[in-house]
Every structure is written in C-alpha cells, then in structure tokens.
Amino acid sequence: MDLEAAKNGTAWRPTSAEGDFELGISSKQKRKKTKTVKMIGVLTLFRYSDWQDKLFMSLGTIMAIAHGSGLPLMMIVFGEMTDKFVDTAGNFSFPVNFSLSLLNPGKILEEEMTRYAYYYSGLGAGVLVAAYIQVSFWTLAAGRQIRKIRQKFFHAILRQEIGWFDINDTTELNTRLTDDISKISEGIGDKVGMFFQAVATFFAGFIVGFIRGWKLTLVIMAISPILGLSAAVWAKILSAFSDKELAAYAKAGAVAEEALGAIRTVIAFGGQNKELERYQKHLENAKEIGIKKAISANISMGIAFLLIYASYALAFWYGSTLVISKEYTIGNAMTVFFSILIGAFSVGQAAPCIDAFANARGAAYVIFDIIDNNPKIDSFSERGHKPDSIKGNLEFNDVHFSYPSRANVKILKGLNLKVQSGQTVALVGSSGCGKSTTVQLIQRLYDPDEGTINIDGQDIRNFNVNYLREIIGVVSQEPVLFSTTIAENICYGRGNVTMDEIKKAVKEANAYEFIMKLPQKFDTLVGERGAQLSGGQKQRIAIARALVRNPKILLLDEATSALDTESEAEVQAALDKAREGRTTIVIAHRLSTVRNADVIAGFEDGVIVEQGSHSELMKKEGVYFKLVNMQTSGSQIQSEEFELNDEKAATRMAPNGWKSRLFRHSTQKNLKNSQMCQKSLDVETDGLEANVPPVSFLKVLKLNKTEWPYFVVGTVCAIANGGLQPAFSVIFSEIIAIFGPGDDAVKQQKCNIFSLIFLFLGIISFFTFFLQGFTFGKAGEILTRRLRSMAFKAMLRQDMSWFDDHKNSTGALSTRLATDAAQVQGATGTRLALIAQNIANLGTGIIISFIYGWQLTLLLLAVVPIIAVSGIVEMKLLAGNAKRDKKELEAAGKIATEAIENIRTVVSLTQERKFESMYVEKLYGPYRNSVQKAHIYGITFSISQAFMYFSYAGCFRFGAYLIVNGHMRFRDVILVFSAIVFGAVALGHASSFAPDYAKAKLSAAHLFMLFERQPLIDSYSEEGLKPDKFEGNITFNEVVFNYPTRANVPVLQGLSLEVKKGQTLALVGSSGCGKSTVVQLLERFYDPLAGTVFVDFGFQLLDGQEAKKLNVQWLRAQLGIVSQEPILFDCSIAENIAYGDNSRVVSQDEIVSAAKAANIHPFIETLPHKYETRVGDKGTQLSGGQKQRIAIARALIRQPQILLLDEATSALDTESEKVVQEALDKAREGRTCIVIAHRLSTIQNADLIVVFQNGRVKEHGTHQQLLAQKGIYFSMVSVQAGTQNL
C-alpha cells in the first residue's frame, strides 16, 4: 500500500544542478563527449572497494532485500485481515452507533486484530533493523571508497607528465575533484541500497501476486511492459541531457576559474562584463539543456502516471469480477492488487537511483580514465637506474623537439651540446629560440622527439625519474612559492633539511636580512604563489630553495632576473660560489652575467650556431657579438662617463640583467593571492562559517519571483497531485464497502463506475504531473543560472582586499561557485513541487479523515510528530555535517589547486609525494563526516520506515475496537488509515530532503552574504565624476598605505610626488620599497590610509580631483598597464590583445598595428594559426618574452591617457628590447607615464626620476641632477654600470 511513497519516488529525479559536473578534458574531448555518453562498467565503479567495503555492501544488500520484501509480506497480512473484517463486521448491517461488543463476532474480531497487530509489529521491528543496516552500511562503504578515489585521482594527476597538462585543460581538474567525485559518491552510496530495496519489492510483490491470484496478476502485468518501456526511455533521455548539461557547466567553471585567477588583469582592463558574458553564455546553454530535460522527463512521468491509474482501473474492474464470481475473496484481490502495485511502483522508486548510478558511471569514466592513464615519464615509478655517484657530464646528441600541444612547431632542430662535469655553460639567444626548452628536457619534463640527452654517458631515460630530478637544482625565470611559510618553502628543496642548513642557504642567497626584518621571520606566510613578497624577495627564496638541495647539476633560467641593484651583485657572487664543482647551465638575456662562463653557446632557430668563451666568440663576430653590441649600447648610461672594460665590473653588472624586471611580483602582488597570507597550505577555514548570517528560504525564492506564473501553475498542479491520493483512498474504501451483502449486478455496475473514475484520474494526472515537473523544473533552472551569474558578478565586483583574504583563494571561490548554486537548486525547483504536493496530500487526507473518523485520526496523527521530529533531528545533524564537509573539502581543494596550478614547480622539486600526503591528510575530515552521516541517516531513515508498520498495528487494533463499539464502519477505518498513512509517508519523503535542505540553507547564506557585501571600492559603481577633459596630472600628497592583510607592515609612509601632463616619471629603488604599490593605488585596487596624526589629510590627486571622487571605471579606462608578470587568457592571441579595450569591438587592423608596435607581429606570422593561435592556460604556450610583448600590445590598443609600465620590457631578449623600448618611447609621447625599472639604463631619459626608500621619496630629479647629487641613485647606477669611478 506504499502508493504515495512510490509516487514520490517516481516524481523525484535529479535536478540539473545535481548533474553539475565540471569536466576536465580538452575541448576536443568535450565536443566528442557531448555527442556520445561514455560510461564505465557497473562493477568497475566499485573497483576501489576492499574486503571490508565488500562486506558492508553485501550486508547492506541483504538487508535492503529484506527491507524491500517487507511491504509485499505486509500485504498478505493486510489481505487476510480485510477478509476477517468483511466476514466478521461486513455481514452485519448495523447503524454506526450500534455496538458489536456484546456479540460474539465482536470479541472474535478484536482477538484476530490483536494477532495481526503482532504480525505488523514483528515486520516493523525487522524493517527497523534492516533499514538501518541497509542505509548506514552502503553509506559507510561509499565514504571509504570515495576517500580512496579522491586519493587515487589526485595521485594520478600529480603523476601525469607535463605534456599531458599542456594538452588537457587543467583549470577544471580541481572542480572535478569535488563535483565529479561527489557524483560518484551519490551513485555508489545509499541509493544502491535503495535500488536493491526497490528490486526486492518488485520481485516479492509479483511473487506474492502469483501465489495469491495468478489470473489477476497476469491482467495487471499486461500493462507493465509499457510502464517499463516508458521508464527506460525516461532514463535514457535524462542521461543524454545530463551529459550535455555537465559539459556546459564544465566550460562555465573553466571561465570562472581563469577570470578569478587573473582578477587584477580583469579589473585593470575593465574586463568584468566580458568575463561575465563569457560565463553567462555557457550558463545559458546549460539552462536551455536543463529545460529540455525537464520537458522530456516530465512527459515521460505524466505517461507513467496515466498508465498507473489505467492499471488501477483494469485491476479493480477484473478483480471485482473475480470476487463477485467467488473465485477470489476480497482479501485475496486486495493482496494481489497491492502487491503488484507496490512492485510496479518500486520501479519508479528505482528510477532516481538508476539515474544517480548512471551519472556516477559517466563521471567515473573520465576520472578512472585519468587514473588509468600511464604517463611515459612517471615520477612515481621506482624503475630506472639510481647510481651511487654522478659526475655531471651532460651531452645533447642531435636533439629534435616540439611541444605536444603544438606538434607542428619545431623548437629544437638538431641540438648538439657537450658540458663537462663542473663546467658552466651559458645559453644565449633571442626569446623563444629554445633555451628554456633545453632546461626542461634535462629535467625530463618532456622527452625529445629524436636524439638523446646523456648524463655521464647514460641516456637520461634510463635513470629513475625522481632520482634524476633530485640531482638537479632549478631556479627559473618565474619563481613559484607555495602558500606556506618561508622556512617550509625552502624545505621543499630537500625534505630532511635542518634549520641551520636553511639559514646557510638563505644567507648565500642574500635573503637573510629581509627575512629577519619580518615580524614572523622564517615563519612568515608568503601567500598564494608568494604574493606577500616582492619579486626580488621571491627570487632569493627560490635561489635558497635550490641551494639547500645541494644539486649535482644547477640550472639557472634567469635566476637573478628579479633582483634590485643592491642585491644582484651579492647574489651573483653567491651563485658563482654555488656553481663551484657543479655542472651549471645558465640562461641569461643580460650577457654581462655570463662573461665568465666556461662555454657560451649561441642559439638561433633551435640549434647552437656557435660556442666558445666570451673572448673567442667576440672574435668570431657572430650571433653573440651582435647581441653584446646591441646590449652594450643600451646599457651604457653615458659612454664617456662609464667604462666597461673591467672584467670584474662586467660580472657585477650581472643579475639585474635583461629579465631583471620580469616576474618581480613586487609588493604589488599583495594581490589577490595574499589570500593565503594568513594560513599556509594547512588552511584553517574556521572563519568561513563563523559570521554567516542565516537566510530565510523565502529570501531565496524571491530571486525566482519573475517566474511567478510558473510557480502558480506548478503549485496548483502540485496541490491537485497531492489531492489525488486522498481521492484514491475514498474510492478504495467505497470499493471495499461494495463487497458486503447485496446484489451482484449492482456490485458490478458500481465497480465499473469506479474503474472509469480511476481512468479519469489517470488522464488528469498526466497533465498535472507534467505541468508540475516542467514549471518547477524550468523555474529551478532559471534560478540556478541566476544564482551562478549573480555570484560570479558579485565576486568580480569585490575590491582587492577581499581577494587578499585567504578564504577567497581561486580554488575556494571556484569550488563555491560550482557547488553553492547547485545545492540551492537541490532544495528548490522540482523538490519544492514535491513538498507542495506532499503537504497538499497530508492536508487533504487529514480533513477527510476527521470527517469520517476523528478518533482514529487523532491516534494516527500522534505518529506524525514522531516522524516530523525524526526529520528535524536528521536535518539539524546533517546541517552540521554539511558545514564541516564543505569546509574540509575546500581546504583539500586549496591544496589540490595550488599543486595543479604550479605543477611544473612541484615536479621540478620532486614534491609530488609531499602534496599528495597533505591532500590525503585533509581527506580524513570528509571521511569522518561520512561515517557520522551514515549512522545519523541510517537511524532516522529506519525509524521513518518502521513507523508505518507500527502504525498499521495500532490503527487496525484500535479500528477493530471502534468498529466493535459502533463508532466507525470498516470502510471508514480503511479510508482514514490510507489517507493519513499515505500522507505521513509523503511527509517522510519531504523530510528525506533534509540533507539537501540543510546544504541549501548554508549555501544560500554564503551566496547572500556575497551578494550583499558592499566593497570599499565598487568596480560596478556609477557614482563619481567623469570629467570631459582629462590631462593626466598626478599628485601623491603625504600618502600612507599598508596592505590590509599585513596591517603592521608599513609600505608607503608619507609619500609625496607630482607628475605633470605628458611627463615620464621613473620610480627606482630596492625590491619591496613600494614602487608597484603606487601603480596599484593609481588603479584604485586599494585606497590609501591615514597612518598617523601627521597624515590626516593624506590623499591622492588626479587633475586636482581626489581619485576617490572620480568614477572608478572611468578612472581605470584612462590607465594602460603593462605589469612585470603579464597574465594572458586561454584564448587566441588576437583576443588577448583586444582585451586591452573592453569598451568596444577592436578591429583586426588595430590588433595587428598594436602587435607591430610591440614587435610581436613577425613571430605571430610564423605560427600556423597566426593571430588565432591559442596561448594556453596563463599563456604557457609562449615564452616569457613573447607573453610580455603581447601584454604591451594589449596596453597600446587601449590608447590610454596615463601609461603604467611596471618592468614592461623585463622579459625581452636583446634583439627585441631595443625595438620595444623605442615603441614604448613612442607610445609615451603626449601621455603621462610612470615607469618602474631596475635596469636604470631604460629610464635615463625620464623627465623625473624618484628614488624610493622605506616607502618615502629619498631623492628626485633628472638623471643628470641625481648623478650630480652622488647619493643613492648614483650608487645604484655605479653598481649597474660596473664601476664606482665616475
């Protein structure tokens, strides 16, 4: 008789949000995936189960079968009991108030009912135990397996070779770690138990049906194949649409992660609307698919209910015929009818379980595919040679190479190079000629296409991969630090390093002094990607990290590029010392740093065209000679004043070199990534939940108010559907009443009428169920799209201090964006329809029941609060569980994101195992929560299931008493019972949404906190002045500033400076002195503070207007920025350049002109797809110099009034720098320009040079004036020029 339970089971189905996987496959694979649904085998899904899991699943399955058999068995008892009622009470035609208690049949009836009550109670006790074991054991087994799958998947990602990351879209891998694996969790947990329960109910129902009355069973079964076919079609349609929907959400997730990861670039170029449009485009696609899914699924559902009611009509018509002809008793007919009905409905209950399982198989296909992917270069492999000692002789033999992602673009074209043990070989050449590629091949990040690389005469492919990388120390041009302490970052160099060794390495790298000035010293957290440190500080820590490794082979790829003048000579000396006795390969654009190398190899077009010592190559007058000449002319401050003949001077000139400005990351980068500044990789996210105000559900629904017509139609249909069940109860009690004494012809006539009524109810239910599901489904899809869009828009609106918060790292925000909206929809949309339906069901049932028998109604209603309290307790406990789970998975997600984003550094440092162990440690929390959830869910589920059996016992025993005492008729007992119990079961189903509701409330609270947060600097604000005329005068007046995340570290301490229209202001000073902070304040990433009583009037002026009073969008539109670490987006070169001006459509001609001005056009023309070439994630497919030139083109296309150049030419090689410098000089004409540079030769023509020290202006004037002062600037120029003799 579990009609309503079945109905609810059928009506429930996964919403689009539940299918919100984020796919991490290449775009090519994605396109393929949308066409065909790929799934793994059923048993393969459980491949990570051990004997304990198998035991849990086996016992869970046995108990699910026992639980599922309970209802059909109860129907046998119900049938026999009905016969007793009809035989004992039905043969008497006494008025309602007449008492049977004095008559013998009454006493017999009470005795019989007591016996049946014991049967019901016994079944209830069995169900109580079975349901608990079924749910809790399957949930436990799922929790254990999911922990292993997460672990294996993360291990598999870390194990892949770098070429795999080039081809696959890594931005989606973290979302896959959370979302896709959650889908597997959904599919292999309690829903499998529910499936077996439904299957057991199905078979038990039909077996009971055949035993008790095969004729009626066969007639009812005639309609079953059609029902089964409609269920199969439904499942197939759902699966196909879910798959397409997942792909659309995956693309949206990738857009969001990319934009949030490059938030400063997005804000500086006013790209928020463009990013939002890109995001919304994918969301719109997902919404459309979701709506089509709702239409298809609900037509199938309407047909299913039409068929179900048609089967009622047929069954009652034929059953009544058999009873009237005395072939069956009424009890037999009822047993057969309800057993078959329950069996058929269980198919409906199994449908969502099948769907969840299908989703899990789809998600697992890609997850397991990555797990099973065996890389050619496996860093976890134990195979390979591990010699006891390595001399360090290196040899390249005819090496050819092209990157996997651009196989048709050859980088190395027959490279031959020999390096003797202990030798230092310098690789020089233009940007993109293959120097850095050589360094990557030595580390076996890639294998050559042809040729071999040997160490000590052995092919490096014969060495153990981990061993090979451990003997190599690397300092790259873009040093990546991890979000932990300085000490821990240096420990990544070598696992078992002591504090003394750390201090020694730090002193050698000239970082000791600045570390000791920090409040937390070695325990200072560096922020995400080292954002809390300046570029020079980061670079020195990276050098210390390499030195502590004590490597046999040292690879220095622009190792001193980010150092200021004060540090570079000392660090260069430290590196010279570190090179002693080691084979060293140095890449440098600044040729003075490599003059003393044993061998200098000149690269051109992927081959070495010349090699020899400095003096030998100068005599040859080839590539090297040409590069030196170009550089010398650029670096002499004034040839008559500085002589560079001194060898010593040349070496000291070194580090600031060519790239010196690239990737300085200076204090500027207190950026977004200071996110992690407070908490290291061991992120504590306790604060995340602390101040989240609860949100009423009404507030969430208000976001759906524009869809009110859908809600009105849907609610009316839901109420109608809710009323169908009590209507069924009324008809059902009337049918039983027919079989009392009376004329058979009249009985048959009445049965025919009731059968037609059933058919009519079926036709109504087709329309009402379709409309209910479709309207709420569509409204739910619109809400999900709206919530995601609003959340992303709200994130893009926030000020920089919000992104600096450790809780708002890219990984955490991406995870929240992917899950919060989905979880809110999990408790709205179609779920809301079911709640409305179930409330209508119970409400109508109670009203009818009070009319027909208030005494029995009151008894039954006493059961309802118990079920309700059980639901509330479950919700409270699961809410706490959901909160902890969310928090702990975010912490794990941060570790995963950091490792995946910086995979090259992780691999170079051989720290894959370290990151894996940290991730695994963070998985213990979610696992512990899943264990608690298993028991809570098991207990509450079993109570709600067993209460129905206990209520049968109480109801019919008390019902017998009421009949015997003349208070009710048997038909009324049946009516009241079926109306109330089915209503209560519906309420139980409503309470089963408790976990979803708990998650939804928490997610909604987070979303509304985000929506309602008013940023200090609102990027979307329309307020503020938008002057018609803007000259470009800038004044800083006593500006005091500290970064919000490090309020106790002063950056600017009373800064005053002035730039007139059209002037070029150059800012110079040591790394971390506040130069880039000036640029950030101009961009209004932050507003200045008043630090002391002396600076109460501190403010920032542009053209006499306080910057705060200008419209922030208008202000940023006047500024063009080229930063030291250019971030490009994973789209075409043309799109990246056009990103410079997001206020209009930029023409192709303008793009080409800007590219020519930035000297990148000739390179682009050599690419197969030219301007349509994709640059890869963060521009990884391009060299540093190529990226920088595209960034310059991007700034030039903006035609800004004020140009901000923060180390704009830092990544350029000798050939390009001069041309680009000329282009920038030209671009500066008529514009106010602020230039930050370590290489002082690039700024000698500035109108005003300002020397910073400790956040204040120490000197200012022209180049000549400052030289004449013989102060700080004079010393810096002297050091760079290589002599103190002026």
UniProtKB/Swiss-Prot annotation:
Reaction catalyzed: ATP + H2O + phospholipidSide 1 = ADP + phosphate + phospholipidSide 2; a 1,2-diacyl-sn-glycero-3-phosphoethanolamine(in) + ATP + H2O = a 1,2-diacyl-sn-glycero-3-phosphoethanolamine(out) + ADP + phosphate + H(+); a sphingomyelin(in) + ATP + H2O = a sphingomyelin(out) + ADP + phosphate + H(+)
Processing after translation: Phosphorylated. Phosphorylation on Thr-34 is required for PC efflux activity. Phosphorylation occurs on serine and threonine residues in a protein kinase A- or C-dependent manner. May be phosphorylated on Thr-44 and Ser-49. Glycosylated.
Result when mutating residue 558 to Q: Loss of floppase activity. Strongly reduce the ATPase activity
EC number(s) given by UniProt: 7.6.2.1
Transmembrane annotation, as ranges: 51-73, 119-139, 189-210, 218-238, 297-318, 333-354, 712-732, 756-776, 832-852, 854-873, 934-956, 973-994
Membrane-side (Extracellular) residue stretches: 74-118, 211-217, 319-332, 733-755, 853, 957-972
Assembly and interaction partners: May interact with RACK1. Interacts with HAX1.
Protein name as it appears in the record: Phosphatidylcholine translocator ABCB4
